[in-house]
Amino acid sequence: MLEKGEHIEYPNTPPLHSPPESHTFSSQTDDSYFHKPSSTGLFATLVADTNSSVPSASRSPESIASSQSNDSAAIPSYRRKRRKVRKPEIVKPTLRKRGRKPKNISTLEHDKSKPVISSLIDEDANLSQIKARKSVLESRFSRLEEAFRDFYIKNLEKTEDLIRTDSHFVLNKELLSFRNDYEHRRKHYEKYSQCLNKQLDHFFSYKVTTVHKSYQRFATLLRRHLLDKTAKRYHDLCEKRPYKYITTDLLSPSLTCFASDILQTVPEYTSSQSSPVLLPATPSIVTNKQMMDDLTLCNV
């Protein structure tokens, strides 16, 4: 155990880049073995400089600058002190304030600007100078007018020649685009009209066939109904006559099929003096007049 006031002395470690013969452990303190730690970073404090044994006075400025650059390069970028750059002040645009209208409008009478025509002419100009100025301006305007007229006439003549020879670039381009658009629209409408005509034909043919079938069915049902009504009427009329043994049932649905039987004979009575009764048969084909008569008769 150590007593108070005593401390352990460790041998001084040699520098990292010292020659091998100097690796001797001694308890004596030697300033050449120590390297003053640099405050620039951890790497510079741990790694000894190769030129530590050389005094600073005898070192060249190039070596000092290189060592300082190495020390600064050893510092990581996020630890370096950045120089503060003064930001330029943002110049704000000045707002133009509208001037207040003066309460007294009479103050503006002296600030009125001169009119344009009067500003072009001096106040001290004579009448002859004004007339000369007027003549100069008139001649200039006449020359400008002639130049513009010649320019537009030449352009119009050139344009007319180009149109006449069918070589006007802009008009030909417009005509070509118009023709292409017209042809495209015409083909489109032709296809559309053909498709529409097909749909209409199909629709009308379907409707015609449907109506025709419905009419045929309705006509058949009406004819059968009228025949049944007329047969019933005939039966009611024939019940009042003295006949027997009728072989055909007048109310049967087969009335439309016995058109070959034009007349039906009824057998004689027990009396030999009576004559046979002739009954009209139900027709298989009904005319329009007979149909209307039957409808009126049967109250259908």
UniProtKB/Swiss-Prot annotation:
Record bears the keyword Cytoplasm: no
Polar residues bias (residue ranges): 21-38
Keywords from the UniProt entry: Meiosis, Nucleus
Gene Ontology terms describing biological process: meiotic cell cycle; transcription initiation-coupled chromatin remodeling
Positions with biased composition (Basic residues): 94-103
Cellular compartments per GO CC: chromatin; nucleus
Function, as annotated: Has a role in meiosis.
Protein's name in the database: Meiotically up-regulated gene 165 protein
Organism: Schizosaccharomyces pombe (strain 972 / ATCC 24843) (Fission yeast)
